[in-house]
Amino acid sequence: DLNTIKRIVATTHIDKETCVIEIGPGIGALSEQLAYHAGYVRCYEIDTRLKDLLKESLGEFTNIEVVFQDFLTVDLKKIVEELKQTYSKVCIIANLPYYITSDILEHIICSQASLSSIHAMVQKEVALKLTDTQYHSPLTFMIESIGTISLDMHVSRNVFSPAPRVDSAIIAIHIHKEYNILLTHLLKQAFTQKRKTIYNNLKVIFGTNTKYILEQCQIKENKRPEELKIEDYLKLTKYL
């Protein structure tokens, strides 16, 4: 549905100074619209069966490049550094299947690439969770540590053919700070057992120093991992 695609592009506020990295171009319908607005579009597609189709649909564009590679194996930091020599902003636009949403977002954040923003179409339930300030997980804390997240648009299942079983939504993450790579290990460990206290979960990392470290960070040891604030986790990284 061209109207929906144009609305999606409008939410991203891209311009000719922007280079877009698109994950999963599919048949290239969104890529085409992105190319009209962005300076350059680099698409990553894992499915080589789409080679001929994408060549046909996007071949006439001089500012689109399609790379057939699993995005999770891409050295994103290096690529963004190269692209920023030509473009003032680099952002990611992605259509993320449910089963790989977290993996892709974590890969992007952990790369520490100097992106301006991430715009992703995800399952509606996932979008509502990630933008709910009362819901906490390692991923929501990772996002909060680098910037802000918003739900920018609802996308009905009926605009797709064939229609999927669920509705989707566009989320945007605007990046203001570099990611602290020490957070990844800390958050994963803190959330290993959500029902356990932060003290019990972090003992694996800090051992006999756990009590002292929590005191230094002014964190009550009987708190659950989701009850902490991102500032608490950032304080804890200093002891790793």
Region spans (language model):
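Hydrophobic, well-ordered secondary-structure scaffolds
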Residues: 8-11, 67-68, 97-99, 215-220, ...
